[in-house]
């Protein structure tokens, strides 16, 4: 289905140890995490909170297992803080990822975000940016995009539940306001379906701008409870709203077909944060790997 040597398969460490709720998977070590990723048949991962930030140390651990770094999340605060604060941290982040050989930087605006707040209802309290904030976001992303390109990297914007860029309308607005040469898109199946969007619409409309893909599934019965009981994003994660591709309700066949028939080259990263005490990360990594092999031939 996919042309040879166009796709690398990664898996996010958040299934082993959760960055937002460190108590989930606190017992899982960095070495266990990357060893199980390799054993499950993946080529690499994004960066988690237990990963060493010394590139020499990290490279050695990964090379022993034939793994690479695909990217790492970066929180921007362009709508709520002076741009200089974001830029200072971004440059360090960019240089680290450049040193690890990554080609994209995952960015997500966290101004007004509720994704990390345990008791704030996800659907009821979703932030909405003012026009002035949209302008700050677009201008700031252009600046970060230029900084990334100084080292040969691209920024990929991660639409995300509980943030100001979550819905189809918001994604379209961001794409309309930003230069395709400077701001690319991360396509995340799980966040789109969780939000009630149509992922294939976004995929088809912005295919040339998509430079990174997160493969994530959802358990619809949990999402329904999140809405009914007005739960937060973190409560949704703890209750199992997300799972690996093939274990939920999302149909991936057309997603893979569209991407295979496109010029997409880069990473597919399985990202399915759930409680590792309830969903063994290695077991679910194997499930995901088998599903991708069967459905995408990768």
Curated annotation (Swiss-Prot):
The protein's annotated pathway? Polyol metabolism; myo-inositol degradation into acetyl-CoA; acetyl-CoA from myo-inositol: step 2/7
Can you tell me which residues the record assigns to a coiled coil?
none
Q: Name one GO molecular function term.
A: manganese ion binding
Report the catalytic activity.
scyllo-inosose = 3D-3,5/4-trihydroxycyclohexane-1,2-dione + H2O
Recorded E.C. number(s)? 4.2.1.44
Q: Which GO terms describe its biological process?
A: inositol catabolic process
* NCBIfam families, per database record: myo_inos_iolE
Q: Which family is it part of?
A: Belongs to the IolE/MocC family.
SUPFAM superfamilies, from UniProt? Xylose isomerase-like
Q: Which UniProt keywords apply?
A: Cobalt, Lyase, Manganese
Q: Please name the Pfam families in this protein's record.
A: AP_endonuc_2
Q: Which Gene3D superfamilies match?
A: Divalent-metal-dependent TIM barrel enzymes
Name the gene for this chain. Answer: iolE
Query: InterPro entries annotated for this entry?
Result: IolE, IolE/MocC, IolE/XylAMocC-like, Xyl_isomerase-like_sf, Xyl_isomerase-like_TIM-brl
Q: Origin, by domain of life?
A: Bacteria
Looking at its record, which EC class is this enzyme? lyase
Q: This protein is called what?
A: Inosose dehydratase
Cofactor(s), by name: glutathione; Co(2+); Mn(2+)
């Amino acid at each position: 289905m996919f042309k040879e040597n166009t796709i690398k398969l990664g898996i996010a460490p958040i299934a082993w140890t959760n960055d937002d709720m460190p108590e989930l998977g606190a017992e899982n070590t960095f070495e266990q995490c990357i060893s199980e990723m390799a054993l499950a048949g993946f080529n690499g991962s994004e960066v988690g909170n237990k990963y060493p930030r010394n590139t020499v140390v990290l490279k050695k651990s990964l090379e022993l297992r034939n793994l690479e770094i695909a990217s790492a999340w970066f929180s921007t605060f362009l709508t709520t803080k002076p741009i200089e604060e974001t830029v200072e941290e971004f440059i360090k982040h960019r240089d680290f990822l450049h040193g690890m050989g990554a080609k994209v930087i995952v960015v997500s605006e966290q101004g007004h975000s509720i994704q990390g707040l345990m008791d704030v209802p996800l659907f009821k309290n979703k932030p909405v940016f003012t026009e002035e904030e949209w302008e700050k976001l677009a201008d700031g992303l252009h600046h970060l995009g230029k900084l990334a390109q100084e080292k040969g990297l691209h920024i990929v914007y991660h639409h995300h539940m509980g943030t100001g860029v979550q819905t189809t309308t918001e994604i379209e607005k961001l794409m309309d306001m930003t230069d395709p040469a400077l701001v690319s898109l991360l396509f995340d199946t799980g966040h789109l379906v969780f939000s009630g969007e149509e992922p294939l619409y976004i995929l088809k409309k912005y295919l040339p701008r998509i430079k990174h893909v997160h493969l994530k599934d959802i358990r619809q019965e949990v999402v329904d409870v999140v809405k009914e009981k007005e739960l937060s994003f973190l409560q949704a994660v703890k209750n199992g709203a997300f799972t690996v591709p093939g274990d939920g309700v999302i149909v991936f066949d057309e997603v893979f077909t569209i991407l295979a028939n496109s010029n997409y080259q880069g990473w597919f990263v399985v990202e399915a944060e759930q409680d590792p005490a309830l969903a063994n990360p290695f077991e679910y990594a194997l499930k995901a790997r088998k599903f991708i092999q069967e459905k995408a031939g990768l």
